[in-house]
Amino acid sequence: MNVKKTENALSLTLKNFIKSESFGGIFLFLNAVLAMVVANSFLKESYFALWHTPFGFQIGDFFIGFSLHNWIDDVLMALFFLMIGLEIKRELLFGELSSFKKASFPVIAAIGGMIAPGLIYFFLNADTPSQHGFGIPMATDIAFALGVIMLLGKRVPTALKVFLITLAVADDLGAIVVIALFYTTNLKFAWLLGALGVVLILAVLNRLNVRSLVPYLLLGVLLWFCVHQSGIHATIAAVILAFMIPVKIPKDSKNVELLELGKRYAETSSGALLTKEQQEILHSIEEKASALQSPLERLEHFLAPISGYFIMPLFAFANAGVSVDSSINLEVDKVLLGVILGLCLGKPLGIFLITFISEKLKITARPKGISWWHILGAGLLAGIGFTMSMFISNLAFTSEHKDAMEVAKIAILLGSLISGIIGALYLFALDKRAALKK
């Protein structure tokens, strides 16, 4: 299959995803830079105090709410993970993860890209209070990685973009498993049973193919609360909810009705302004088209811009700000070195070595249209951990280990920046080299 055929095989949904995530990556970067500037300016005290401001409502002596930081990390990030869960479900059912042949190479790459960074970090920080941060360099920020690829444009094969997206989706799934297994404390089984009950109700709704999103979202709020109270991070509830959202398209006459409405619109007279009849027809077309979409597609379409242009940039602005002064101890255990080496060295080596060995052992096969040099380049870009790595660092280090958290954030920013620059320069040079050979 040549590059032209691969280009044609890339679905419209995937193209839109690349575009939105790429622009989202640039916006994320600007918010991270702004956070660092503000955190090291005369506004730093106001900046840090802002995130500890309680937000909610008071009933007598009882306060219902969280600090702004918790609203972002626990509530808004749950919406982000809901979108991630929807993307994973779609890819598992219809996309690049829908068959073993398609999924094996990027999934194996994702596994290698998580194990190697985690081992590097753990080896450097074993038997220290910071060893629990091994999950930090395991993550990949798809928005940033695709932002870099967008800047490279046609210098990057489309097949490599597909591979990187699929790898990142598998990486997100791995990150969810890591959070559930290693960053869960003080389990409360009564709340877990409550969560299980909600999941069973959601499963029944899915089985009955209830297409309205309202009952799913209302039960999702209840599920979030039960999981939050159980000791498991609440974002896991969002992923579970995503897998319960129906994906079936209704089998009815709405597509025929759409064609008839289209013919009616074409037959109406056109002028400078739409007539009342044309407006009514267009409104009907919009309603029928929306009804043809599955609940999963509707929810994903709704969440994508909110996540890309509001939730993740806000998360970056709230979490990337680190005050770099003489009081910060960069030598806390080996956190700085562990995170940077994990992202910059562990990611590309893990992805390259495990896929190379797997192909030699005939476990999987490299996608057509990309070379091993391209795989190494994708591995470098996968070292951009940023938002996902920061999210895990917030779970790994408590307030008692604040120094390690601050150092981890600096390391994430440095490691992600180094990986992005080296990855971009490497792929640019690779394209130049290929052009000279022609």
Curated annotation (Swiss-Prot):
Subcellular location: Cell inner membrane
Name of a matching Pfam family: Na_H_antiport_1
Membrane topology: Multi-pass membrane protein
Transmembrane regions listed in the UniProt entry: 23-43, 62-82, 104-124, 133-153, 162-182, 185-205, 221-241, 302-322, 337-357, 372-392, 410-430
Reaction catalysed by this enzyme: Na(+)(in) + 2 H(+)(out) = Na(+)(out) + 2 H(+)(in)
Example of a GO biological process term: regulation of pH
Domain of life of the source: Bacteria
InterPro entries according to UniProt: Na/H_antiporter_dom_sf, NhaA
Family that this chain belongs to: Belongs to the NhaA Na(+)/H(+) (TC 2.A.33) antiporter family.
Function according to Swiss-Prot or TrEMBL: Na(+)/H(+) antiporter that extrudes sodium in exchange for external protons.
Entries under HAMAP family matching the protein: NhaA
Protein name according to UniProt: Na(+)/H(+) antiporter NhaA
Gene name of this polypeptide: nhaA
